[in-house]
Amino acid sequence: MARSSKRGPFVANHLIREIRNLNIQKKRKLITTWSRASAIVPIMIGHTIAVHNGREHLPIYVTDRMVGHKLGEFVPTRNFRGHAKSDKGSRR
């Protein structure tokens, strides 16, 4: 089920607090977070947020087109190596 519109989007408290402090100081620095479920809200535009993918933090520059999406959507967690090459000897 989708989240109720009257409740608003989920954003981790530490993330909101840090972004608001940076906006007040008019600074832009890298913000690291493990909160992949946090939604991107308009106050995040212009910030770079490093989101954890299970192994490392990958930086994401937030633009206006990302508003409404989740942070985890922009960081892939799985590493696809490709299918095995055609090996006719292994078929039999």
Swiss-Prot record:
One GO CC term, this protein: mitochondrial small ribosomal subunit
A biological process term (GO) from this entry: ribosomal small subunit assembly
The UniProt record lists the keyword Disulfide bond: no
InterPro entries documented for this protein: Ribosomal_uS19, Ribosomal_uS19_bac-type, Ribosomal_uS19_CS, Ribosomal_uS19_SF
Superkingdom to which the source organism belongs: Eukaryota
GO molecular function, one term: rRNA binding
Subcellular location: Plastid, Chloroplast
Statement: the UniProt record of this protein carries the keyword Cell cycle: no
Entry keyword set: Chloroplast, Plastid, Ribonucleoprotein, Ribosomal protein, RNA-binding, rRNA-binding
Sequence similarity: Belongs to the universal ribosomal protein uS19 family.
The protein, known as: Small ribosomal subunit protein uS19c
Source species: Adiantum capillus-veneris
